[in-house]
Amino acid sequence: MSKRCYYEVLEVSREAQEGEIKRAYRKKAMEFHPDRNPGNAEAEEKFKEAAEAYDVLRDPEKRSRYDRFGHQGMNGMNGGFGGFQSSEDIFGAFGDIFGDIFGFGGGGRGANRMQAGSDLRYNLTVSFRDAAKGTEVELNIPVTDTCDTCEGSGSAPGTSPETCSHCGGRGAVEQNQGFFRISVPCPACNGRGKVITDPCSECRGAGYVRKQKDLNVRIPAGVDNGSRLRLRGEGEAGMNGGPHGDLYVVITVEPDKVFKRQGQDLVLSTEITFVQAALGYKLEVPTLDEPIEMDIPKGTQSGEVFQLRGLGLPYLGSSHKGDLLVEVKVKTPTGLNSRQEELLREFEALDEEKPMKKVKKLFKKAKDKVMGE
């Protein structure tokens, strides 16, 4: 039976990069691994086929030769599956792959490797003014952290874990699985390679405890809904001496009664009388600090927007600020008394006379010109 194209086996293109080839092999190895397909001869063959393809395509020299000459070009090279004498050879060669997938490499080499702790998320709601000016808050976070009593060893103070006698400290034992002899986590020590004979009374041998952690967090000025603050090392504790994960504080900003937000600009809507709009006015405008006076020019129309530069929200990590946008709405008077109505009608009549006077002047000029001729 003729061999399939290695690119076809891993389902990648001939232009695939190293990372893409590795991901494709991980997928195939996970799908056809003997542990997941006990007694399945077809899966076993596909597992070997994928290992052979990956061994060639991951190596630039072998891949170049294969691209030029195909399978015939691999004869005489220690490449392809012919270079592996047993499943241990496969797990040994690709231990990083199997360690990522199953938590340990061939022969248990990855059983006790360090693992980073999980990241945590904390949702924090702040007021509009605190988001604008910045603030400091105290958080109380539930976390899984290293036990202070045993310092993470899991053993009672003054004692230490002992090497597992079942696996000799390897964290894994070998089992026959069809064609392969594979490594699986040691059932006696759960893959740790060590056993705790005198467990810590505080964590009961786990090495970790659930507790509340108090943190003071500085919220920078200018944060918005959805802003994320990353606190390195404040997440869950790592395994086997691995680093802590991170804590992500996700911000929600409460709405404000006075201002609305457009990016880093503040928007304020205010009303003035039609007299103030017509004659001009000095308007007191609230800001994030002290109120200021703004000139409303004569003839201002309802809906006009005035821009006050630098009175908005600060940009994160910058001294620059957005603007304050003041939208003016002219209020139409209601509930007028008779005298007010009379004055308004007089005003309207005076306003209507102006164009008629202009027309009469034009006719007079035209008449004088004709008579003069």
Curated annotation (Swiss-Prot):
UniProt GO molecular function: ATP binding; heat shock protein binding; unfolded protein binding; zinc ion binding
Primary site of residence: cytoplasm
Record: residues binding Zn(2+) 2: 164, 167, 186, 189
This protein's GO CC annotations: cytoplasm
Residue stretches making up the J domain: 5-70
GO biological process terms, semicolon-separated: chaperone cofactor-dependent protein refolding; DNA replication; protein refolding; response to heat
Compartments where located: Cytoplasm
Cofactor note: Binds 2 Zn(2+) ions per monomer.
Keyword line: Chaperone, Cytoplasm, DNA replication, Metal-binding, Repeat, Stress response, Zinc, Zinc-finger
CXXCXGXG motif repeat positions: 147-154, 164-171, 186-193, 200-207
Keyword Repeat tagged: yes
PROSITE patterns: DNAJ_1 (PS00636), DNAJ_2 (PS50076), ZF_CR (PS51188)
Zinc finger annotations (CR-type) as residue ranges: 134-212
The record's note on its domains: The J domain is necessary and sufficient to stimulate DnaK ATPase activity. Zinc center 1 plays an important role in the autonomous, DnaK-independent chaperone activity of DnaJ. Zinc center 2 is essential for interaction with DnaK and for DnaJ activity.
PANTHER family: CHAPERONE PROTEIN DNAJ (PTHR43096:SF48), DNAJ HOMOLOG 1, MITOCHONDRIAL-RELATED (PTHR43096)
Family: Belongs to the DnaJ family.
Classification via NCBIfam families: DnaJ_bact, PRK10767.1, PRK14301.1
UniProt function note: Participates actively in the response to hyperosmotic and heat shock by preventing the aggregation of stress-denatured proteins and by disaggregating proteins, also in an autonomous, DnaK-independent fashion. Unfolded proteins bind initially to DnaJ; upon interaction with the DnaJ-bound protein, DnaK hydrolyzes its bound ATP, resulting in the formation of a stable complex. GrpE releases ADP from DnaK; ATP binding to DnaK triggers the release of the substrate protein, thus completing the reaction cycle.
Subunit composition and interactions: Homodimer.
Protein name: Chaperone protein DnaJ
